[in-house]
Regions:
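Extracytoplasmic small-molecule ligand-binding "clamshell" domains
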Residues: 23-103, 112
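Alpha-to-beta junction loops
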Residues: 74-76, 94-102, 146-147, 184-197, ...
Length: 271
């Protein structure tokens, strides 16, 4: 009786394994059979990966990775993490991963040497304020009263002129370094950046600054879009795209974004 029970369990496990190996679009297309190898940075940073521990599934990219893997038929235990530098992964040639997630913007130049999935994130515009304006509420009414700066050649200017409509003239600068310096020197109160850049500037570059709010991505002109990076010609691409498309269609992708890039960062949508 016991032998028959054990045999039944083993048979069930074997059937499940075979079903996974041969019945899914990822079958035979990964570096290691029945495993999905995903690369992240060394280290990986908040809020994309929490505490430099992608295996926890915490952080926006870590959470997206596990949700996508599940859609592709891989349980969490079959997701393998490796580390790469940002630049080495963009180089042409064979890769030691199936997918790489390090906030890679999809660009025509990069697509010459690597493949990208459909976008899993479109970076919205966010408001970065200097230390003198950190108590500003994330509302359109309050944003109008700030002194704004922007790089003259960017879409931030039209966003400010047509959407925010500040009460004082927008100060124009040659590049982002000049805008950053102006915020640091309290020459301006605020500037617009894509959310990843704004979070980085606040955490690392501009002491006392704060990201007080973000616009929805669909309200941004030509937003920066992140894709999962793959070796050029990777046969897994269609399967990855199917999984990401389903996550987007069901609202799961938006829910992950809200959890990790709005709630966790404390950067609410501007009203």
């Amino acid at each position: 009786m016991i032998k028959r029970f054990v045999f039944a369990l083993l048979s069930s496990a074997l059937v499940t394994s075979v079903a996974h190996a041969w019945g899914h679009c990822a079958a035979g297309k990964t570096l290691t059979d029945c495993k999905l190898t995903i690369a992240t940075g060394n280290p990986a940073y908040y809020p994309w990966v929490m505490d430099d521990a992608p295996e926890s599934g915490k952080g926006f990219e870590a959470a997206v990775a596990y949700a996508m893997a599940s859609e592709m038929g891989f349980p969490a235990a079959d997701v393998v993490w490796v580390r790469t530098s940002f630049d080495e992964a963009i180089q042409p040639g064979a890769k030691n991963f199936d997918l790489n997630m390090q906030q890679y913007s999809i660009t025509p130049e990069r697509e010459i040497v690597v493949d990208f999935s459909v976008p899993y994130y479109s970076a919205p515009m966010a408001v970065l304020v200097g230390k003198g304006a950190v108590d500003t509420a994330p509302t359109m009414a309050d944003l109008k009263g700030l002194k704004w700066g922007a790089v003259g050649s960017t879409t931030a200017v039209s966003k400010l002129e047509n959407v925010v409509k500040p009460e004082s003239a927008i100060l124009l600068y040659a590049d982002n370094a000049d805008v950053n310096a102006a915020i640091s020197a309290n020459q301006i109160d605020a500037a617009l950046f894509d959310l990843p850049t704004a979070l980085f500037l606040s955490a690392v570059m501009i002491e006392g600054s704060k990201v007080i709010g973000q616009f929805s991505a669909d309200a941004s002109d030509n937003p920066d879009q992140f894709g999962m990076l793959m070796e050029d010609g990777n046969a897994l691409k269609d399967c990855v795209n199917q999984a990401l498309t389903k996550l987007a269609a069901t609202g799961r992708l938006a829910a992950i974004e809200a959890e990790w890039l709005q709630d966790t960062t404390g950067v609410p949508l501007i009203k």
